[in-house]
Regions:
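Asp-box/BNR beta-propeller blade signature and adjacent active/binding-site loops
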Residues: 3-453
Length: 453
């Protein structure tokens, strides 16, 4: 064990399949932390509890059978609960090959704490497909929502291309808004005609003759389908991550036509501002960023005002200065300085602030602030390797926060380092959850704040 992980590192999620992780490392996988493969960490503190969220994958790819999983720590990261699955996608197949995409999937969790104390987890959801890795099968010409009773409601399509609308009670209406006799639980995808199960709207194919009812994980495609594209699903916990709500689709509240088939979550954490506004970071396929916000603890969501996109390049995270200004840090197209945007109105609008002197490759980074100090975890090489936590301080120009002066860095690891997530554990410590292998090996470390600054 001492050879496989360094002092201070704790294995939080560990793959058990040698096809996706070095065989020696799979020996650290057990019932408390294991699965076939893992990627994309999110870490947050809720009360005195740390919650680590992750994509629990079937094959290590960005598609296939991907569940959402968490572990919890009530002692500052010293010990962790057994792995808990909080969202299960519908699937026709749960095979382990990366050639298999016979399943819907979740991907890219992002958590934050609402003013009322609830944990909010926003995540991408895709019907059965390969997501952005096979754009040709995404439904570019099918509208995913239609205006019905002054509200954007989800749509379904039959094999002839006719559209249907789902009303608030789950009834499926024809394109003429007449009741079809069908009902659907939209987020889970289960479609019924009366009491007869018709299949799942998020899956391909049609009903086989030997299956008559839905099963927990494997089922079949329904005659009506949701458009193949990215959706935004929100989960909520009111007890520090012990239990979670069913996923709720919020895409229709914030989507605009220009977004195309992808308006996705920038993984990591969101931000609850000093004024109580909850902001979540999104981005579109053109590598521009979007922020959405809620002023009622995540019940309803709004898109940022002004220009529909901020030029902040790809996946991004944000921090708030004591003055209230919010700085967003993006992912560069290649190794170099980090793109930066600033909002002076609590995340309603954003200004392109050029680049900050934080050098990193094309990779997600995590950033949090404590007072005037900013902490950012990222690879410190031209490739995804050599993780560090870089520390800086907000600075002002003409009386306004204008950027961050970076002045020190602390090594996290040597070798592979990709996606990560920072959180404040208590008054004296911060923690980091990070990918220490290309797939399936997610570690946690704790640092004293005074040693970093």
């Amino acid at each position: 064990l001492e050879v496989l992980i360094m002092s201070g590192e704790k294995v939080i999620f560990c793959g058990n399949n040698p096809d996706f992780l070095d065989k020696k490392l799979t020996t650290l996988s057990d019932a408390s932390n294991g699965g076939n493969a893992f990627r994309i960490p999110s870490l947050i503190r809720s009360g005195n509890t740390l919650i680590a969220a992750i994509d629990r994958q079937s094959c290590g790819a960005d598609w296939g059978y991907i569940e959402l999983a968490i572990r919890r720590s009530e002692d500052g990261g010293e010990t962790w609960s057994d792995i808990q699955i909080i969202a299960i996608p519908p699937a026709r197949k749960t095979m382990l090959s990366d050639e298999c995409y016979g399943s819907a999937f979740y991907i890219d969790p992002c958590m934050t704490i609402a003013p009322n104390g609830d944990v909010l987890l926003l995540v991408d959801f895709y019907p059965e497909c390969k997501g952005l890795h096979k754009r040709s099968i995404l439904d570019k010409k099918k509208a995913p929502y239609a205006l019905y009773n002054k509200e954007m409601r989800p749509t379904l399509y039959d094999r002839d291309g006719k559209f249907y609308v789902i009303d608030k009670s789950g009834h499926v209406l024809s394109h003429r808004y007449t009741d079809t006799g069908m009902t659907v639980d939209y987020e889970s995808g289960e479609l019924y005609s009366g009491e007869a199960y018709l299949g799942n709207i998020h899956l391909n194919g049609k009903s086989p003759s030997n299956i008559n009812e839905a099963e927990a994980k494997t089922t079949f495609g329904a005659p009506l389908k949701a458009p193949k594209r990215n959706y935004l699903y929100l989960l909520r916990s009111s007890d520090n991550g012990k239990t979670w709500s069913k996923p709720k689709d919020i895409t229709g509240q914030v989507l605009i036509k220009q977004d195309g088939t992808f308006l996705g979550v920038a993984p990591g954490v969101g931000l609850t501002t000093h004024k109580g506004r909850v902001i979540m970071p999104l981005y579109v396929d053109r590598k521009q960023t979007v922020s959405i916000y809620s002023i009622d603890d995540g019940e309803n969501w709004h898109r940022m005002a002004g220009h529909p996109y901020a030029e902040n390049v790809d996946e991004w995270q944000m921090v708030q200065a004591p003055s209230g200004a919010i700085i967003g840090l993006g992912r560069a197209k290649r190794y170099g300085k980090t793109p930066m945007s600033i909002s002076y109105d609590d995340g309603k609008t954003w200004i392109n602030a050029g680049k900050t002197d934080l050098y990193a490759p094309k990779c997600q980074k995590s950033v949090i602030s404590i007072g005037d100090y900013v902490f950012c975890s990222h690879p410190n090489d031209k490739t995804r390797s050599n993780g560090v936590i870089t520390v800086g301080k907000f600075y002002k120009a003409k009386g306004k926060v204008a950027g961050i002066n970076w002045y020190s860095e602390t090594e996290v690891n040597k070798g592979f380092f990709a996606y990560s997530c920072l959180t404040r554990i208590d008054d004296e410590h911060i923690g980091i959850l990070y990918e220490s292998e290309p797939s399936s090996f997610i570690l946690f470390k704790k640092y004293k704040i005074k040693d970093l600054i």
